Amino acid sequence: MARHGCLGLGLFCCVLFAATVGPQPTPSIPGAPATTLTPVPQSEASMLSLNLGLNFKFHLRGPAAVWGSPVTETQPLSLGPGQEPGEEVASGLRTDPLWELLVGSSGNSLTEWGSTEGGSKPRASSLLPESTSRRSGPSDGPTAPYQPRRSTVTWDTALMVTALPSSAPRPHQSELELKFDMALRAGAAPTLGHRTLPLLPSLRASLAEIAGRLGPFGFFGTTLSPLRNFSGLSPPGETTSTSSASGVSGSLGFLGTTLSLPPYSLERKLSSPSPLDPAASLSFASIATTSLDPTVPISGPDDLSPPASLGNPSGQPECGPGSCSVGELPEREGQPPEAPRPLFFLTLEADWAEARARWGLAWEAHVYGVGALFGLVALLALLALALLPWRCPPGAPCLALLDLLLLSAGTTRAFPLFYDAYGHRDRLPALAWLLLQDLPLPCLAAGLGLACLLLARPRPPRCPTGLAALLLLGLGLAAAAALGSAAHRPLRPLRLASRGLHAFLAAFLSGLLLALSCWGGRRRRAGAPLGGSGFKGATPLPQGRSPFAPRESWRRAARTAPVAGTFGLLSGALQGYEVLHALGYGGQSGLEGPWPWWAFQLGLRLGEVGVALPLALLGLYPALCSPRVPPRCWAKLFRLSPGHAAPLLPGGWVTGPPDKEPLGSAIARGDAELLQLCALAGPGPDLLLQGGGCRGFEGAAANPAPSPASSPCSDYTVDFRPPSPINLRRSIEEALCSEALLAPGLFQGPAFEDALPGLGLYRTASLGTGGRASERSGEASGPAAPPELPSPGAWPAGSSVSSGSFCGLSRDSSSMLLCSSPDRPPRCPLVCVLSPPRPSGSSPSLPASGSYQALSPPSRDSPEPASELQAEEALLQEQFLDACRQIDELSVGSDTIDL
């Protein structure tokens, strides 16, 4: 009665749960049995199901059910860690009458429990758990030999191991024992290409999952291994097996990156089976739900021998010389396979051939399109560098550094994209590829900092020490990270630190650039110049200015700042996420695969191009559209210009009143030539008077009209050409013509000041500064001069005077001449002539004291005739010339002359 009661209970449970399991699709090949957890085909829609399979295991123990009963399977069932060895006989065909009563005649093929297809006979085969292997068909009929298959570990098989521990085998009894192993599983039906996590997995899988998620690298989700862990390790067709459910996640990868089998490789192996392979033609769903225990060897197609260590879970399988292929060699426990260097922080999860087949034209557009954009950045930076020496805009050193950084970033990005995009052809060594991958990041970050300086400072920006140190630190850190990660595996965190630092700098400087563009635009619209004091009107601008000092130039340059700042924030965010993903945070299940990887890499490249291209335009604008282009920029660049030490200001004048300096310093400075000399064409007189009424020159022309350019308040350098080369005579005269050598009464005095108010001497820069000339003209201001003056004499024939000039040279161009103001009333005040030295004996009446009284001009009521006046003037001229010659003779041998 006990046997019949157990049998009835079993049949009742089978009928009860037949509807719960539902109909299952038939296998693709006739005679191939199906399993319980066959996923829904790809064409059918996924639906939520609740599988309450009571995985029945019939343990038939009796006189006919012995341990050594032959079975018809060529590959034994894989046992769980705690499964009894006697449980494997449940799948074999028995000769016990009770077995025939339960399962029917031996000609019927075994189908899965609860299936309603294939006939009206009851299906009494048990539901095996997911950890067991497939069963072969009956041995009665002529069937093809069973071909063992390689199994693939998936999430369905790894997280649903429901083997329960059991004790030692019991003594054989002649009774029917029903054992219920309930595996409650709820969730969506598995579909091809997607992994499903059970809502209520088994106890062992739950503990492993909880331990993995509570770890530091799996809190936000399970991350994946680097790119080439699966695409470059094994030949096609090779799979990887794990030891347990908790062994699905390994320690491979970068900084705790877990190891999981790629679902795309499984899909590739299962979606296109060969028509000539009967084992590959089996249902791919049955293969997906099959688990392979590492303790059971995987035999080749020609090896039908049972394993030697069937009941030893810890024993290693033994393979003959030809029984195990390369891809079927067992893994050594506790020693994971060696993973290559992780070139990417977000994995591709497929090999390059499959990924490029999926991408199609998108791969070509990604590689060549982005490579062309980086090449354009490099060309713009090179053009700006070539134009900078010719245009020489303000702030040229800072612009040159910006162009150099952009040229480096553009070339290091464009070259690997065209030559070996993302290393898929393995043309570049790993170290070179890592350097080309990491070095553009500090260059772009430093470029953003230079853009902030160019747009923020009104004066010519000087590259500060902090920015230069930061640039060197970033480049050194990137190079050290690439070298360390390529040489030694434990130094890989240095590469993460470098990438994180550059991501933070890019985001920070991009935000600062956006803020500067907005704040500077508001300040410009308010009307105050950027960096100025707020006053209006004509103000003296400094000699060196910012390349964007004009309002219109700054406004045009500021248009590139929002674009560069926005793309810089995008690039920094993507790089930061890449670092977090490598650390184990943010790795969601939908981010692995070719298309997410393609989109992520495209976003990174577009963010870098969006930063580099506006910065290249920013550096090119001053070189093309600089409002002020100084001449001879090459000479100034290489210090070849004669005026590079002190450039001349417009008109030869300084902006403010000059300080009182020694007269000899005018030659040393070279920029105080306020009144240059001019050479007269042809022979000229010894004495040149312009606008004066001096007697003694007969046949003088009428008084010429005063030139407006010769007035004391006008520019004195309009009618003059550049000065002639300095000779020794002129240098000595200028060095000795100081106020300390001449008496205070010379050219001054009561008679001169009373008789000639408003008249003054205009001296060249070699004899004094413009300030002294104005002081003398101010001291001599007074009432107007008498209207009646004698007419001056005529100019000698052959002489020529520059229009409006009041100085000249003698016939031999070796002496300097001073004349009075031409716009004053026509009088001849005092004239001094410096002529070549003559013998000192020609002036016997020269006083011995060396001090002379000021010469008074002739008055209107003077009774002296014209001949006497002419003789007196000639005598005075001779006395003055003799005094000058004596000074020259005494000072020629002096050591104090500064040439």
UniProtKB/Swiss-Prot annotation:
<feature type="region of interest" description="Disordered">
    <location>
        <begin position="110"/>
        <end position="152"/>
    </location>
</feature>
<keyword id="KW-0732">Signal</keyword>
<dbReference type="InterPro" id="IPR052836">
    <property type="entry name" value="PRRT_domain-containing"/>
</dbReference>
<feature type="transmembrane region" description="Helical">
    <location>
        <begin position="392"/>
        <end position="412"/>
    </location>
</feature>
<feature type="transmembrane region" description="Helical">
    <location>
        <begin position="467"/>
        <end position="487"/>
    </location>
</feature>
<feature type="region of interest" description="Disordered">
    <location>
        <begin position="295"/>
        <end position="340"/>
    </location>
</feature>
<feature type="region of interest" description="Disordered">
    <location>
        <begin position="769"/>
        <end position="797"/>
    </location>
</feature>
<feature type="compositionally biased region" description="Low complexity">
    <location>
        <begin position="840"/>
        <end position="851"/>
    </location>
</feature>
<feature type="transmembrane region" description="Helical">
    <location>
        <begin position="430"/>
        <end position="450"/>
    </location>
</feature>
<keyword id="KW-0812">Transmembrane</keyword>
<protein>
    <recommendedName>
        <fullName>Proline-rich transmembrane protein 4</fullName>
    </recommendedName>
</protein>
<feature type="modified residue" description="Phosphoserine">
    <location>
        <position position="641"/>
    </location>
</feature>
<keyword id="KW-0597">Phosphoprotein</keyword>
<feature type="signal peptide">
    <location>
        <begin position="1"/>
        <end position="23"/>
    </location>
</feature>
<feature type="region of interest" description="Disordered">
    <location>
        <begin position="839"/>
        <end position="869"/>
    </location>
</feature>
<dbReference type="GO" id="GO:0016020">
    <property type="term" value="C:membrane"/>
</dbReference>
<keyword id="KW-0472">Membrane</keyword>
<feature type="transmembrane region" description="Helical">
    <location>
        <begin position="370"/>
        <end position="390"/>
    </location>
</feature>
<keyword id="KW-1133">Transmembrane helix</keyword>
<feature type="transmembrane region" description="Helical">
    <location>
        <begin position="500"/>
        <end position="520"/>
    </location>
</feature>
